[in-house]
């Protein structure tokens, strides 16, 4: 099974507002950068999109070390998601899970892979996390002044 490192980040100008996501995939000496964005979104949605896009870009089952600076993504995928699925995508307080369609997409995107989730402190000088942040900001740029509704660039 191919081993991949994935670094993901999301960004938002206003929350909600225009946002972007970025991801870096690294295996052996190869690097692939991905980015995209939306006109009206939240930071949490962009963090989820970065992880979904990174995993969805893999063309075969892989062992993935996925690095995120999002506590929301880390806690959701490592703990909350199993309870949400058992509860019909409701929280412990019986409220609908926010961003349920993205959590469902992330759950689906991870299925073919063995994913090891890692949290890194954002904006702390981690080079790949900093680059993922740059990609997220680039992905957001077309929407900051009223551009399209969404964009994905590989």
UniProtKB/Swiss-Prot annotation:
GO terms for cellular component: cytoplasm
Subcellular location: Cytoplasm
Job description of the protein: Endonuclease that specifically degrades the RNA of RNA-DNA hybrids.
Keyword annotations of the record: Cytoplasm, Endonuclease, Hydrolase, Magnesium, Metal-binding, Nuclease
Cofactor requirements of the protein: Mg(2+)
Protein name: Ribonuclease H
Residues at which Mg(2+) 2 binds: 9, 133
Any GO MF annotation of the entry: nucleic acid binding
GO BP annotations listed: DNA replication, removal of RNA primer
InterPro entries attached to this UniProt entry: RNase_H, RNaseH-like_sf, RNaseH_domain, RNaseH_sf, RNaseHI
Alphabetized HAMAP family for the sequence: RNase_H
PANTHER family, sorted: RIBONUCLEASE H1
